[in-house]
Amino acid sequence: MRSVVTCRLWTLPGAPDARAQLPVDFTVDPQPPYLVPHSKEPIRLLYRDEHLLIVDKPTLLLSVPGRHPLNHDCLLHRLDRQYPGVSAVHRLDLDTSGVMVVPRTKAALSELARQFQSRQIDKTYFARVAGCLSPDTGEITLPLTRDWPNRPKQKVCFTSGKSAVTRWRVVAREDKSTVVELFPITGRSHQLRIHLKEIGHPILGCDFYAPE
C-alpha cells in the first residue's frame, strides 16, 4: 500500500511576496515510481516506408518513457536512434507483446491519430485467463479511472470513471484456463486486465491484477 502525505504552507509577512497569506495545499508522494528493469529483447521490424514503421514490441519493454527519469529505455527511444523523428500514436502495456504502428512524419501522426480516434483501426489481443470462461462470446462494460493511492493501477468507478468496453471470444478451453481473443472497443489504461479480473477470470501472469 502506498501512502500520500499532504502538506500546508503559509507565506510569512515580510517575505518577497506577502500578498497571499492563505494556506496552500500540495501533495507529496513519498515513494518513487516503479523502476522498469532494462529489457534485452530486440524489436522486430515488420514493415517500413517513408511514412511509418510497423514493429513487434517484446514483453517487458515500455512503449514510451516512464514517469521516472530512469525509465527511459523504451520502444520509441530505441527506434528513434535509427529512425529519427518517430512518434507514438498508441501504446502497449509493459507486459504485452504485439504489433505497433509508429508514424515517422507529422502527417502520418495526424492521420493515424484520426483513425484511432474514429475507431477505424481494429485492435485484437490474445490472452490466457484463469478458469473456464463462459459463454463463448461476451461484452464487458465497466467504467475505469486511476487508482491514485496505488498508481499506476486503475480501478472500476461508476461515479467518475470513463466508459470502457471490451468484447471477448473464446479460442480454447483447457483444464484450468481459457485462451481468449479480446477486442477493446475503447482504449483505457489496463482496460483488458481489469475487465477480465472483474468478471472473475484474470489474465494469467499479470503482476498487477491477477492473484498469486
Show the residue positions of the predicted features:
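RNA pseudouridine synthases
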Residues: M1-V165, V171-D175, L196
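Pseudouridine synthase
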Residues: P69, W148, D175-E212
